[in-house]
Regions:
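Nucleic-acid nuclease catalytic cores
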Residues: 67-92
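Charged phosphate-binding loop/patch that engages nucleotide di/tri-phosphates or the phosphate backbone
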Residues: 97-122
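Conserved catalytic cores of phosphodiester-cleaving nucleases, focusing on short active-site segments
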Residues: 34-36, 42-52
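Short strand-connecting beta-turns/loops that link adjacent beta-strands
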Residues: 39-41, 80-81
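Helix N-cap / beta->alpha transition motif
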Residues: 59, 87-95, 109
Length: 122
C-alpha cells in the first residue's frame, strides 16, 4: 500500500461523518484523489499528498485543475517526518508549490481538518 493510500485509509477511519469516494482516474489527468460529501450535503474534492520534506510536488495537470477549479477543492498534505497533516485550499496550489509546507495552512491536524470540511456549506 502506497503512502497516499495509507493517508486515505487513515482519513476514512478518523472522519467517518464524511462520505469519501476514491477517484482512480487515468483518463482525466489532474483530477483530485477524492470526491467527498459532508453532513450538510456539500460536495468537495481533496487531493492527497504525502511528503518527506518541505516541498510538495504536483503534476502540471494537478496545478491546472486547481487553477481552473479554485472553489470547493482542497489539498491534504501529510509530512512523514513529524506526521503533521495540513489542509490547504485548492486556490493556494501555486503558493503551495512555491513555498512548500512553510505556507500557512487553513487547518492543522486530521481531526481539525475533518471539522472544517464537515462545516462546508453549513
Amino acid at each position: 500500500m502506497g503512502p497516499e493510500a495509507k493517508l486515505y485509509k487513515k482519513l476514512k477511519n478518523k472522519l467517518p461523518q464524511i462520505s469519501w469516494i476514491r477517484l482512480e482516474n487515468n483518463s482525466l489527468l489532474g483530477t483530485p484523489d477524492l470526491l467527498a460529501y459532508n453532513t450538510s450535503g456539500h460536495f468537495f474534492t481533496v487531493e492527497l499528498k504525502v511528503t518527506k520534506g518541505n516541498k510538495v510536488k504536483f503534476s502540471p495537470h494537478q496545478i491546472a485543475f486547481h487553477v481552473k477549479h479554485p472553489n470547493n477543492t482542497f489539498i491534504l498534505v501529510e509530512a512523514l517526518g513529524p506526521g503533521t497533516v495540513k489542509l490547504f485550499r485548492g486556490s493556494q496550489i501555486l503558493e503551495l508549490e512555491a513555498c512548500g509546507l512553510e505556507l500557512e495552512a487553513c487547518c492543522l491536524g486530521l481531526e481539525a481538518c475533518g471539522l472544517m470540511l464537515d462545516s462546508l456549506g453549513a
